[in-house]
């Protein structure tokens, strides 16, 4: 995702975004884009602090103002704090992009307080809200493409903490949603969805 953001910043001069005090972990900093501040309104990296709700409200406001394409980011387990404003994004048909990271049981020593369980179901249940949980870098790039080309629908990119190996066949149908990555002959022993 971080590589995609840095490719997009060169093609989208109106791209601006940031994280709730987790940019190095979320990989959401745009290199050589400066930090938005009182001294530098041209900076494109926003530092929201530990304020997920305010971050999302600010992202909505920037999108409502027009002219900017905005993304916000935090750990997926903290997405609960973004929910009221994320719902307003959907209701207002505001195509804000959410980058939620660390969706994995491999999140490390922080234990269950940092393990998102119900958040994916919550966002998937929200009307007019796209949710992508890409399996690799190819699907992540496709999810970003869908997010930045959306005109009326907010998008959540739900990403793992770990680097993931490319999946064979993940490219062709990545924008379709669910699809078969690896089929078998005969009756399968297991179907993994």
Regions found by a protein language model. Name each.
Residues 1-158, 163-165, 174:
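Thiamine diphosphate
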Residues 151-153, 173-193:
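Long hydrophobic segments that form regular secondary structure
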């Amino acid at each position: 995702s971080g590589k995609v953001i840095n490719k997009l910043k060169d093609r989208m001069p109106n791209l601006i975004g940031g994280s709730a005090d987790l940019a190095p972990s979320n990989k959401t900093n745009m290199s050589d884009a400066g930090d938005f501040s009182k001294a530098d309104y041209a900076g494109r990296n926003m530092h929201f602090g530990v304020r997920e709700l305010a971050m999302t409200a600010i992202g909505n406001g920037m999108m409502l103002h027009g002219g900017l394409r905005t993304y916000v980011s935090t750990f997926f387990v903290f997405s609960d704090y973004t929910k009221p404003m994320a719902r307003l994004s959907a209701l207002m048909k505001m195509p804000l992009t959410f980058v939620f990271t660390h969706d994995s049981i491999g999140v490390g020593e922080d234990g269950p307080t940092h393990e998102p369980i119900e958040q994916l179901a919550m966002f998937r249940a929200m009307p007019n809200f796209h949710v992508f949980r890409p399996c690799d870098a190819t699907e992540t790039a496709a999810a970003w493409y869908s997010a930045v080309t959306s005109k009326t629908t907010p998008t959540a990119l739900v990403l793992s903490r770990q680097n993931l190996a490319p999946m064979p066949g993940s490219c062709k149908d990545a924008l379709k949603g669910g699809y078969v990555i690896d089929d078998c002959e005969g009756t399968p022993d297991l179907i993994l969805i």
